[in-house]
Amino acid sequence: MKVLVIPDIHLKTWIFDRAEKIIKDGKADRAVCLMDIPDDWNMEFQIERYKETFDRAIAFAVDYPDTLWCYGNHDVSYPWGRLETGYSPYAERTVMSKLEELENSLKSPAQINIMHRIDNV
């Protein structure tokens, strides 16, 4: 099985577009997203960008329901109150609600975790 590892997103929606193309082209059977969806340098006031990025992640989760999701330090920094570089207090509510929306869009809660095992690896 070929597994596509989607790297840290950090507000870059185009990464999901590229991942989608790779899967559609048959170069991967499934994906694992390393998340780190929020936060990027000098983007703390760009709340719409946060929304757009999470919405793209949610759309990807719906379109590719076997995708596994690994929380990154930037994702958990919001609910855990452990601020990371690039943390946006202005986007906090958005991140928290969109993260919950992403979790609820998955067919199983087991699809999102700190780590995953695929084929005993």
Model-identified regions with their sequence ranges:
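Binuclear metal-dependent hydrolase catalytic cores centered on His/Asp/Glu-rich metal-binding motifs
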Residues: 121
